[in-house]
Amino acid sequence: MQVFWFIPTHGDSRYLGTSEGARAVGFDYLRQVAVAADTLGYEGVLIPTGRSCEDPWVVASALAAVTQRLKFLVAVRPGLMAPTLAARMAATFDRISNGRLLINLVTGGDRAELEGDGLFLDHAARYEASAEFLRIWRQVLAASHDGDKVDYDGKHLSVKGATVLYPPLQRPHPPVYFGGSSAPAHALAGEQVDTYLTWGEPPAAVAQKLDDVRRHAARHGRTVKFGIRLHVIVRETDAAAWAAAEDLISRLDDDTVARAQAVFANMDSEGQRRMAALHAGGTRRTREALEISPNLWAGVGLVRGGAGTALVGDPATVAERLREYAALGIDTFVLSGYPHLEEAYRFAELVFPLLPRAVRAKFDNLPGKVLSGPFGEVMATGIVPRAAQS
């Protein structure tokens, strides 16, 4: 099991849908979140993409310099950059970060945003172009280790003599992650992707998606790894966790929810449609209606696009729900919580000790652990706190 955190380059807050409790985007804060994730033993961080975010490549490059082990899941956008340019960017980042790059292929689903960036392809054509983009990207980086060049003639993209002179450290290329819920997305994942990501739907729905991707992968003689994107709201008691969930959306009003849902309804995204269906387009607002599966809460999606569900509960319950997803075949969990700095600590301290040995070991054996840090404050100048009971 690998646990990732999230860098909130679009801003952060204690509440959704209001400026109350909000934190402005700034590098000092993003650095705090990244260093916390690195220090606490998270495997890596997802850096989001889109017009509401700071540029992920610039942010990742800056954060790589202030972290030691943390991996960076960074977006490439077919249609917005050439595949050979993206290959050079990936190779350079991988080299300067000592092999800490992971690629998140993002086709996009917001028509207004895509058109604002000059991309006017429909859904089917975007996936055709994305498949061609990824074929070129993968081939160019694989060939770079031997100094070879690549020719490719496709419907949307063509290159002749494409090459990268300085290959990435990871062979044949940094691993590719990708999420999508439509049939073309599953086909693309099965053919070319290393790890398929899904947003946090109920386990039965997730299992169906994973099985479909497996079928596509089998046609190409491949196997694909799986990951899930979720928010988390964990507290020492179940009641406290649900109170925190209610508090997160306590500042929302009907107009704010309606305006957000109108934007989502105009998106050309099967994944966003499935997220909206979980809360009936914002019309389900009670805790009972928003708990769409045991401890899986759709309240975040009332106003947040993309990943709109959270696991809510005490540490043991949240850990058990993660194990349920792991039993489906998921081994990468990309998590987040509001505010992201405090919740990175809270999740690591409360849930990491309950996760598989590989995760616990990273948290327990962090370099530089001292008695006055993770073991608590030394009392009366010489009394070390007793060990917690696991």
Swiss-Prot record:
It catalyses: an alkanesulfonate + FMNH2 + O2 = an aldehyde + FMN + sulfite + H2O + 2 H(+). GO terms for biological process: alkanesulfonate catabolic process. Belongs to the SsuD family. Keywords: Flavoprotein, FMN, Monooxygenase, Oxidoreductase. NCBIfam families: alk_sulf_monoox (TIGR03565), PRK00719.1 (NF001939). This is Alkanesulfonate monooxygenase. SUPFAM superfamilies: Bacterial luciferase-like (SSF51679). It is an enzyme of class 1 (oxidoreductase). PANTHER family: ALKANESULFONATE MONOOXYGENASE, ALKANESULFONATE MONOOXYGENASE-RELATED. Its EC number is 1.14.14.5. The lineage of its organism: Bacteria, Pseudomonadati, Pseudomonadota, Betaproteobacteria, Burkholderiales. GO terms for molecular function: alkanesulfonate monooxygenase activity. Catalyzes the desulfonation of aliphatic sulfonates.
